[in-house]
Amino acid sequence: MIKKILTTCFGLVFGFCVFGVGLVAIAILVTYPKLPSLDSLQHYQPKMPLTIYSADGEVIGMYGEQRREFTKIGDFPEVLRNAVIAAEDKRFYRHWGVDVWGVARAAVGNVVSGSVQSGASTITQQVAKNFYLSSEKTFTRKFNEVLLAYKIEQSLSKDKILELYFNQIYLGQRAYGFASAAQIYFNKNVRDLTLAEAAMLAGLPKAPSAYNPIVNPERAKLRQKYILNNMLEEKMITVQQRDQALNEELHYERFVRKIDQSALYVAEMVRQELYEKYGEDAYTQGFKVYTTVRADHQKVATEALRKALRNFDRGSSYRGAENYIDLSKSEDVEETVSQYLSGLYTVDKMVPAVVLDVTKKKNVVIQLPGGRRVTLDRRALGFAARAVNNEKMGEDRIRRGAVIRVKNNGGRWAVVQEPLLQGALVSLDAKTGAVRALVGGYDFHSKTFNRAVQAMRQPGSTFKPFVYSAALSKGMTASTVVNDAPISLPGKGPNGSVWTPKNSDGRYSGYITLRQALTASKNMVSIRILMSIGVGYAQQYIRRFGFRSSELPASLSMALGTGETTPLKVAEAYSVFANGGYRVSSHVIDKIYDRDGRLRAQMQPLVAGQNAPQAIDPRNAYIMYKIMQDVVRVGTARGAAALGRTDIAGKTGTTNDNKDAWFVGFNPDVVTAVYIGFDKPKSMGRVGYGGTIAVPVWVDYMRFALKGKQGKGMKMPEGVVSSNGEYYMKERMVTDPGLTLDNSGIAPQPSRRAKEDDGGAAEGGRQAADDEVRQDMQETPVLPSNTGSKQQQLDSLF
């Protein structure tokens, strides 16, 4: 009877086993063909960030969620490979993808618990899961994982599997792969890890947060000890090595990639261009983009602009806290503030801080990045003292939770604020259009709006040279005499009213030459010139410089620069004067490399004198250059003469009520445009002239940019002649008699006080010297041939 029962039981068990094996076999036969292809493993391309460099190799931008450096398995030190194997898969080199003994142990534990509580995933299984499967704990997912692991083992070598694991695994702190983790946790190359450091990192794959040595040092230490004991058990290390590693004091030094903060506007321009071409792949394919800007030029340009904006803001009242965080519900105020401050940047030595308390004496206790606390007394508060708990300032008052800026002045902290005034600087290679420096504002972090390329502003008198160039092309000369006298134009004002434009300084010089008029920036002369050549002709001609029709008003006000354009476009247009009349295109990208170091794209720029289209007659460009040299020598931009160079030319610009101030200066090699103004246009007051606020920025930058470069000046082209100190096109030494100039009107005589006063010239500079007025020679001119620009042929960047 017992024998019969045993036989029956054995038969049932055997039957169930056969049935189970059959089911498993069927499941394998059904599932295995449906497993995903291993192409992503065999041709592994990890997500790598977009990195942007200056021309001299400085990192100026990095974009992408995953910070990763792909490393060959042979470049990982043996001590790290052993530590990971000891921690995750001691039988890695001895199994076929699944550790059967480990599975058995885990199965027993899961049966006892009644659910999937633990596994025995090998490194190969983890690779399968990380690349193809979810993290859910189900028997179906585990079954697929086992089959995938087997398939991987049949297709890839053990070292290749290990290489995939070492590069793909997430290890906390935004570190993907052990090479990245070595930098982030210890700030060192993975090849330089000690045994103790390797064992610590090897503990992270199991639970990156739980075993993070920075956040949970005690748990991480226990995990490290476990791994070292495993290594000893596997005869990977000796007892002495284990003990030394356990006693080694580890120093955690988070790696912070230094990104040049002065070129963030340039980096953002590149990011946008790459995103337009590649979409989200731009952030994962490991592109390395080299730009045309130099890091040292960027630093000088940024400081030059910031200096002017700071100086303008000096003496302004305190505008209030820049932000506010609610600390009333925080259980750990110090940690809350630290987390908040970690997302802010120190800009121009202005350090972000959060107010923790305001004392009865109205002293302010602040917390700085790093946790340091500082008490600011009334002296340290300075101009911000009135804002302390001032209910009249509403949300902008200084109170608990207020975010403010402070600066360390010789060991004493004081409240400061970022200036409200903004600006931009653009510097181009005149012959190629390559951007050498570009600053889009005071601080990219607070306002990413790039004023160099996005701010549409009136260029004011910096636009006049284009009108004068059109006049030379139409039949005038640099010595054409025009009456600088008031003029009234019926029907040209708002709603058909009378337009009575004025010179900005209220002074009129009577009959003066074009050279004198541009040097002193005379509005009346510019208007009379445009009346003579015609608005339509001027629009058509000025488009040769790269301006769009929408930027050129179809009215006489165009002569005063009332159209709107960007600083970059103005700099690009001035390059036509600088390079002898050729149209070049601005660009910031020079080369693009892929993750493997292969050159993917290289800019082939239009070059003046080679493949760039001729925009204007080179003689026209030369004569304009010589006229604008006088603007620097004796005119509204005399501040630029501080460089002591004879090859500089340029033009200032100031719009109505001093809302926008400009200076564009150049020599035959470099064009630099500076714009200053508020984001919400308003008057800058008495100092808001191009000659007083924009020129100093230009000088500070160009002093560096032109250092060591000889000032040769522009070479006079063929067909230009000089007579009585003036320059003419050979065939045109007189004004075209077919042109009609309205020289009516009488210039009012200045008062005796005005005669004695040197100041108050156009745009706030000193009055330009009154050269002797030259009368035109009465000869019949020969008009030049058509010099309209060709269609640009800029090679595709991608």
Swiss-Prot record:
Biased composition range(s): Basic and acidic residues: 768-777
Pathway assigned in UniProt: Cell wall biogenesis; peptidoglycan biosynthesis
One GO term describing the cellular component: plasma membrane
Keyword ATP-binding: no
GO molecular function terms listed in the Swiss-Prot or TrEMBL record: penicillin binding; peptidoglycan glycosyltransferase activity; serine-type D-Ala-D-Ala carboxypeptidase activity
Membrane topology reported for the UniProt record: Single-pass type II membrane protein
Pfam families: PCB_OB (PF17092), Transgly (PF00912), Transpeptidase (PF00905)
Subcellular compartments: Cell inner membrane
InterPro entries per record: Beta-lactam/transpept-like, Glyco_trans_51, Glycosyltr_51/Transpeptidase, Lysozyme-like_dom_sf, PBP_transglycosylase, PCB_OB, PCN-bd_Tpept
Catalytic activity: [GlcNAc-(1->4)-Mur2Ac(oyl-L-Ala-gamma-D-Glu-L-Lys-D-Ala-D-Ala)](n)-di-trans,octa-cis-undecaprenyl diphosphate + beta-D-GlcNAc-(1->4)-Mur2Ac(oyl-L-Ala-gamma-D-Glu-L-Lys-D-Ala-D-Ala)-di-trans,octa-cis-undecaprenyl diphosphate = [GlcNAc-(1->4)-Mur2Ac(oyl-L-Ala-gamma-D-Glu-L-Lys-D-Ala-D-Ala)](n+1)-di-trans,octa-cis-undecaprenyl diphosphate + di-trans,octa-cis-undecaprenyl diphosphate + H(+); Preferential cleavage: (Ac)2-L-Lys-D-Ala-|-D-Ala. Also transpeptidation of peptidyl-alanyl moieties that are N-acyl substituents of D-alanine
Cytoplasmic side: 1-9
Chain positions covered by the region annotation Transpeptidase: 378-700
Polar residues bias locations: 783-798
Keywords: Antibiotic resistance, Carboxypeptidase, Cell inner membrane, Cell membrane, Cell shape, Cell wall biogenesis/degradation, Glycosyltransferase, Hydrolase, Membrane, Multifunctional enzyme, Peptidoglycan synthesis, Protease, Signal-anchor, Transferase, Transmembrane, Transmembrane helix
Active site location: 88 (proton donor), 461 (acyl-ester intermediate)
Annotated segments matching region Transglycosylase: 50-218
GO biological process, one term: proteolysis
Residue ranges of the TM segments: 10-30
EC number: 2.4.99.28, 3.4.16.4
Ranges of the Periplasmic topological domain: 31-798
Gene3D superfamilies, alphabetized: Biosynthetic peptidoglycan transglycosylase-like, DD-peptidase/beta-lactamase superfamily
Region (Disordered): 738-798
Protein role: Cell wall formation. Synthesis of cross-linked peptidoglycan from the lipid intermediates. The enzyme has a penicillin-insensitive transglycosylase N-terminal domain (formation of linear glycan strands) and a penicillin-sensitive transpeptidase C-terminal domain (cross-linking of the peptide subunits).
Entry similarity comment: In the N-terminal section; belongs to the glycosyltransferase 51 family.
Protein name, UniProt field: Penicillin-binding protein 1A
